[in-house]
Amino acid sequence: MKKIFNALNSLFLLVILAWGQPSYLIAQDIQPAHFGLLYPLSTQGSSSPQHINYFSVHALSGISGGERGLAVYGLAGIIRGDAEGLQVAGLVNLTEGNLQGVQVAGLFNTAGTSNEGIQIAGLTNLSKGNTPIQISGLYNKTDKSDAVQIAGLINTTGQSDGVQVAGLGNFTERSSGVQVAGLVNSATVVHGSQISGLINRAKVVRGVQIAGLINIADSSDYPIAIINLIKNGEKRIGLGTDENLSTMMSFRSGGSKVYGLIGVGTNFQYPELAYGFEAGLGLVLHDRNKFRMDLEAFNLFMTDFQGSEYSKSGIRLLPALRLGQGLQLYGGPSLNLMHTENNNRYRSGGLEIWGTQRWGDYRSLDLGYTVGIQLTL
């Protein structure tokens, strides 16, 4: 094991030294093929950085001035000029010039520029300029991407005009496509969509933000999340109740068109339903002068954490009247799908349209209402 480690360490040192050779060692002529064990043990010897090849195969590592076809390396490949075609390495591909083809490496790809290239690596891809496609298990970085970046953890680019998909986060200055991340998307300007499991952050969004928890932006008309912190948007706190006296303290936040809703509260009709939680999304239908009209989709869950449970999902129409000083009085009808256990059925205070007992649970479709008061922050 120690011998293998020492051999890999020596190979790594050789790669670093070869990569650091002076820039005057550029390709002088074109060769049909290049075969070797590792630099300089090859058919071209120490002059290999001065040759462009159409076909190269190296058992461990190889160095050339350029490649125009297929280049295969057991561990590492170094190209001091441009690369066209396909590069395949067990560990690392290093291209100093422009990549116009495909790099495939077990660990790491890097290219000076890659305007018409594709980089696929087990860990990391690095490139300057525009790289159409980067796929890695860990991290992608390029100055500009106009097609696809896919990474297990992080994508970063100055400008993205395509799709970024990352398990952890996408980070770009300007996005004109789609950002999809498991946790975080971050951009300065977005002309497209941000979709994340947790947080989206941007300054200006001309599109849609969809997050599992929070959207943050200076300007965003269509943020879809439970909490939306939009600088030029709206934030409201309110107190409301429904036909079952489920009374909630709520926080509504979002842009000029779409907002999110989160709330906590209790039920005054059924004391055992002591703890209530609510979440939803709202659409602004009308907002002018002293009157506004919202349409909300919501889910309400009540429990005592000891077996008593009640849930209600539905839509509600909420006209609101502005009373002055940011105060609004709202109230309107709702269409609710209610669910509870048979032996703990909590009857609706509204009008039951349909009900059924099935598999030990009771479900019903009801007409209800919501009334309350809220304050614009």
Q: Where would I find each of the regions flagged by the language model?
A:
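Residues that define the transmembrane beta-barrel architecture of outer-membrane proteins
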Residues: 51-53, 129, 174, 189, ...
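Residues on the lipid-exposed face of transmembrane beta-strands in outer-membrane beta-barrel proteins
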Residues: 57, 212, 226, 247-253, ...
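Transmembrane beta-barrel strands of outer-membrane/channel proteins
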Residues: 59, 90, 106, 122, ...
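Outer-membrane beta-barrel strand-turn architecture
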Residues: 63, 94, 126, 141, ...
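Residue-level detector of the transmembrane beta-barrel scaffold of outer-membrane proteins
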Residues: 71, 87, 103, 119, ...
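Sequence/structural signature of outer-membrane beta-barrel proteins
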Residues: 77-79, 93-95, 109-111, 125-127, ...
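Repeated loop/turn-to-beta-strand initiation elements of outer-membrane beta-barrel proteins
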Residues: 98-100, 114-115, 130-131, 145-146, ...
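Predominantly the C-terminal beta-signal and adjacent terminal strand-loop region
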Residues: 217-220, 255-258, 315, 320-377
